Amino acid sequence: LTDEHSMRIGKRVENGKAEQSGVLGNKQCRSLILDSGSLVVKVYRREIFMDSGIRFPEHIFYEDNAISDAVLLQAHHYEYIPEVMYFYYQHEASTVHTISRERCEDRMAAGRGILENAKKFGYLETYRPEICFEYTMLFYVNTLFSYMVGKGHKSLSFIRKMGNELKEAFPDFADNPYYQERVNAEQKKMIAMQQRSTAAFVLYYKALWTWRNFRKKHFGKK
């Protein structure tokens, strides 16, 4: 990561793992769905896109998330290069710094793309636990808590729709072993609350962070 237009190495972020390298079998594919890293730091054969017809969705942010699985699962071989070869410039207007309902809706659209491509290319059932967790995190968990952090009025109908759409896609998402292992206890508690009552979730979230911010301001505690 870098905050300037240069080749100076800033914070180093790993993308991918050495054990994912080699001919892609079931184990490697599951790992790549779960921990693929960013699509933009990879080099692909042109034929993967040309032969499959896979294209980036237009007019949304997070467009790489929508097709990452579909592209990787078209490949037969993957190699991880443990060198700094991509410099990601972050600025105040970048997607990692900007939270708005529109950005949240873009993230949800990218999540739908994950599911649509899994159905289109026929790998949903093969990798259902991995797709379920990936979709849950991108479409719902990350979007929900990003939306709550953002300023302004919180639309109960928007949050409710988000939760309902997740349940329609994966009714048993909370039983997923990756969800159980990788989502922290506090988030699980609040997600379960939202699934029962959106209004109760929003009130609890606001009260919790009002108290935490007060405590941090006056007592220096997080």
Predicted regions and their residues:
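Short, charged, amphipathic alpha-helical segments
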Residues: 127-134, 156-160
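C-terminal, non-catalytic tails of nucleotide-sugar-dependent glycosyltransferases
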Residues: 109-130, 168-182, 188
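Membrane-interface aromatic/basic loop that binds lipid-linked glycans or pyrophosphate carriers
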Residues: 149-222
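Nucleotide-sugar-dependent glycosyltransferase catalytic core
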Residues: 59-60, 68, 77-110, 124, ...
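Hydrophobic alpha-helical core bundles mediating ligand binding, dimerization, or RNAP-core interactions
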Residues: 68, 111-114, 139-140
